[in-house]
């Protein structure tokens, strides 16, 4: 008759094999979720996925990753407690992958909750710069170039710091400086009209390849000049602060250029 200690020893390899299999499955699921999240943006950018499908893929990947993170952490503790080091290491790998998959979308979601639900930001809410040259490029885009009072109200509350820049140089010099800064931003310059003191450009986001259109307007202001800017997304309801960040970055560089 086999006594209890001998039976435990006999079952140990089989039990360890089962734990390793479970840990391997968790790793595979975590890797699949990470891959789905990574491919969602390029999938939309190259026309394989629609916008809704791409966003939904990220949402589901992040949700599943959050669940797998908990499973992997519990699995790590249990496997280590039972002395199954290899299975524990696999669970650690799964936890790391799940953490990297779930954290960025979660941060973006929380950030979006505290930002205005707008996709159009300008330094002049009373008389925003108007698009001209980029209009043909916006055919079929979901978002209109019409600036509404509802957008202005949300911008005032969410981005009170967005304001025009005053330069102590004539308008044509301000235009030249603005054009130089615009080129340094890596945007595709669509038009630079010195006669109208207007610059238009398009910025493309890295992951999804979203197109955001920019217009910069320069006006005389006494002995100096005033520079206004507008940044508008072609698709999407909320831009998660991207357009406001772009306007701030441009204006800061323009002011730094003046200081030098």
Language model segments and positions:
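Membrane-interface segments at or immediately adjacent to transmembrane helices
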Residues: 107-183
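Membrane-anchoring hydrophobic segments
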Residues: 1-35
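Short secondary-structure junctions
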Residues: 184-192
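Internal/C-terminal transmembrane anchor helices
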Residues: 82-112
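A conserved amphipathic terminal alpha-helix motif
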Residues: 236-260
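Short beta-strand segments that buttress and anchor functional surface loops
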Residues: 200-205
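Membrane-embedded alpha-helical segments of integral membrane proteins
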Residues: 25-79
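Beta-strand/loop substructures that line and gate deep hydrophobic ligand-binding cavities in soluble
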Residues: 208-237
């Amino acid at each position: 008759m086999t006594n209890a200690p001998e039976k435990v020893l006999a079952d140990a390899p089989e039990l360890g094999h089962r734990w390793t299999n479970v840990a391997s499955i968790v790793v595979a699921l975590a890797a699949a979720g990470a891959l789905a999240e990574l491919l969602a943006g390029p999938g939309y950018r190259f026309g394989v996925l629609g916008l809704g499908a791409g966003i939904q893929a990220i949402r589901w990947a992040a949700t599943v990753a959050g669940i797998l993170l908990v499973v992997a952490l519990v699995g790590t503790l249990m496997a280590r407690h039972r002395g199954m080091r290899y299975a524990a290491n696999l669970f650690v790998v799964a936890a790391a992958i799940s953490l990297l998959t779930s954290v960025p979308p979660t941060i973006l979601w929380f950030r979006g909750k505290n930002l205005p639900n707008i996709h159009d930001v300008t330094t002049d809410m009373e008389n925003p710069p108007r698009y001209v040259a980029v209009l043909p490029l916006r055919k079929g885009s979901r978002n209109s170039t019409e600036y509404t009072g509802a957008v202005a109200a949300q911008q005032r509350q969410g981005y009170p710091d967005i304001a025009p820049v005053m330069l102590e140089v004539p308008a044509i010099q301000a235009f030249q400086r603005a054009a130089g800064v615009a080129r340094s931003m890596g945007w595709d310059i669509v038009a630079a009209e010195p006669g109208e003191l207007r610059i238009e450009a398009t910025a493309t986001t890295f992951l999804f390849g979203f197109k955001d259109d920019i217009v910069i307007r320069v006006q005389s202001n006494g002995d100096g000049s005033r520079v206004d800017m507008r940044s508008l997304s072609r698709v999407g309801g909320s831009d998660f602060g991207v357009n406001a960040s772009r306007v701030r970055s441009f204006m800061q560089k323009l002011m730094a250029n003046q200081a030098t």
